[in-house]
């Protein structure tokens, strides 16, 4: 039997014939789609064919025809309503089609009324505008250029002419929507391409911007989508960084509206007024098509540096500007208080409050008097708050809480606990701002009256983060929070803060590797320096935490401090970590490390045993490092004293010199104090190492380092160190004190010059003099005995 091809009529196809060019007739390259495969092979003949008919494709043809006819009828109604201006868009969730309608149906749709409406059959054929934009839902895709099928219908001899400036202004001022749409379609591509300033001169651009703002003045009959498009054009005109001409036009128009005597513009608005109030009036109309676009423009013309400088600066204190500042802040606060306000709009309001409050102290006062702190507290308490709202709120809180009384107001509301409840949030940028705010709050006295146990536990859980910013700020919170309330340190110890701090220090090389990656990537030097300072801050914070929880001041809870010392001594990494920072750390880290070691060894003497043979980074043991650090810091202390004397009081240089002097003073007296303890009470090998270092390796005489300008605390510990190393059994037998005094050529009368009002120092000097005199007598006796013994041996020699 002879095979036949598929029946053409069966599928309703039409023969193709060439037509002459007609600009009013759209064309298409889409062919009709058959409802089933055209192959004559049966399923048995081609069982493995991927094109085999599937059950879902084998529906009765009548249902398919019925569906396509209904679709064509809906499409015609949809297009007719659109063209007659009666179109009401359906709900986006219920919308069937994702494209704007075509002005004219496609060829196949007109011929067969069976083609389903798709993005290929819903084409723009407007030959006057190469870009058909979506006027209803911004989320819908729009044609970026004229489609190929529409290009076929354009007359190549007819070129599109640009609208003149008077035509644009007149069209925008018109009450006819079609005229406004034509002007907007002229401006929108230029605005999106950021080409308005390069296309128009300043005078022409000023006329256009003024006309756009005039469209925003409420009218009896207006289209919300036109208003939205106007807001978008104005926003795109102002958003680029380098559009000084546009910014000046905005500012000039604003000043003219604020001037009650100006009659230049015919805006039907009360005087005084401003472009800000024009935008605010539109933004306050919630649930409109343009409220979000209005808020976006308002945030831009409030927070951009140019407008903050010339509109919201503290220098602008005229009556009109003060009134404007109050209007903007009142609107922002009111918007935050309304439940109906969209969360994105609330985020814009918070950003406006944050930026303008930082720039202008009077605006800060206006906002504070409008009770902005309870509003911020409500935002962070709301578990459904969006990240885009929480993030600027955290930034604003950090700004406001830098003022002590404001921070205490926030803490009294329970704000610190509510902030810590957000520590489980997945946003990194949010955690950065949250912990920065908590660092400020943790220094306030009011936080001592709050129950912070759960909050402290949550902060401890994030200190081990690989994010250096989170680690720095979390450790900063723990460093501060124990000061206002000593009970907080008990909570920290109970939750294992010592182990967490040591673990961060033990694994700190991960931060160094991140820093090396930045250096290899040729990151700018200022960012490299910031990263180095951040890592140093992490070290200081962790060592400060260990220092704070082991502190035994008069207000501290001794049981907790002793427990912290025991926990540190039991940690297998503690000794190597503390020795490393004494060896290679910055001065502040050295001070904290030696202080922690001193306290732990004094309370748990067994903690000294690991240091007997433990080498540091430079292969030097603890007693040698303590001796080196004491002498190095003593020299630095002398230099810092001179810097303090040469610096002007109340200057940064003076404060830096004071801090440097204090750091090195602490290193000196704490190092020699710990060394004295080790020589007296520790393993005898500690003294052996000190003896070899001072007498043989690097001959050192402690008396030569004494000088009258020594502070009391250094002098006392230095004298005690001399007594400690000269009071051992070996030293007494070998008259080490007398050896040092004789070598330094120091008399007992000279030592009396070091007496101070402090009786403890006087006692130390007296003990040194007494010990020196006894050892001198002992030395003289030994010499006499040696001389007598020599004489006896000489006499016994045969003549």
From Swiss-Prot:
Name it: Armadillo repeat-containing protein wrm-1
Q: Which gene encodes it?
A: wrm-1
Comp. bias regions, Basic and acidic residues: 1-10
Task: Say which species the protein is native to.
Answer: Caenorhabditis briggsae
Spell out the molecular function terms from Gene Ontology. alpha-catenin binding; cadherin binding; nuclear receptor binding; protein kinase activity; protein kinase binding; protein phosphatase binding; protein serine/threonine kinase activator activity; transcription coactivator activity
**A GO CC term?**
catenin complex
Q: State the residue spans of region: Disordered.
A: 1-60
Main site of residence?
A: cytoplasm
What keyword terms does UniProt attach to this protein? Activator, Cytoplasm, Developmental protein, Nucleus, Transcription, Transcription regulation, Wnt signaling pathway
